[in-house]
Amino acid sequence: MVNTPLAHDLLWGMTPAQLPADAPQWAIDSLAAGQPVVVRRALSEDGCVAVGVRGRFREQRLAAFMSVDSIACRVSPEALCQVESARDLPVMQALRQLRPVLDDCGWTWGVSGSVGFELASGFTAMHERSDLDLILRTPQLITRNQARKLVAYFEQAICRVDLQLQTPFGAVALREWAGNASRVLLKNAREACLVSDPWNPQEQAA
């Protein structure tokens, strides 16, 4: 692959043979069925990418590593913004409701979580009580007031909406950045740390 996979990207091509020897049967079955894996934030050796395998149930998640040479297909969250589903679940209603706001917000956005997984793969992952997980590519600062305005829009949705701001230094939850705390949790492949500015994370907790 020319481009390095990013967190939340979906990758096809991993086989059960790449799983740890003690991998549960559900993980073997998931890969054998042709399901994609999702890129996670973790350090990996050269030639590998840290991924997560999904099972049918929420508690079925397995951390693993995929060979970069095995990647047959990659789908990013932003490639799923306009994808529809025949299943008229609350989470899809929320996505349709918020699309105009997100399209006009000025940043690149994408769909992740169970919704992104099902829209990209066709494998059932959404249910009646699913949250809508989104990402926003924010290479430059989004002000806290801008974050609060987005949260206000999301509060009108029919289901819970969780959005992660993707900064050059890691990810921070939109709701946290829209809050009043002086420092927020920034997550990247190396660590999770408290910072006052996710776009200039010089102040970190020990």
Swiss-Prot record:
Enzyme Commission identifier(s): 2.7.7.66
Active site feature: D131, D133
Keyword Lyase: no
Molecular functions per Gene Ontology: nucleotidyltransferase activity
Superkingdom: Bacteria
UniProt key word Transferase: yes
Disulfide bonds: none
Function field: Transfers 2'-(5-triphosphoribosyl)-3'-dephosphocoenzyme-A to the apo-[acyl-carrier-protein] of the malonate decarboxylase to yield holo-[acyl-carrier-protein].
Name of the featured protein: Phosphoribosyl-dephospho-CoA transferase
Organism of provenance: Pseudomonas fluorescens (strain Pf0-1)
Lineage per the UniProt record: Bacteria, Pseudomonadati, Pseudomonadota, Gammaproteobacteria, Pseudomonadales
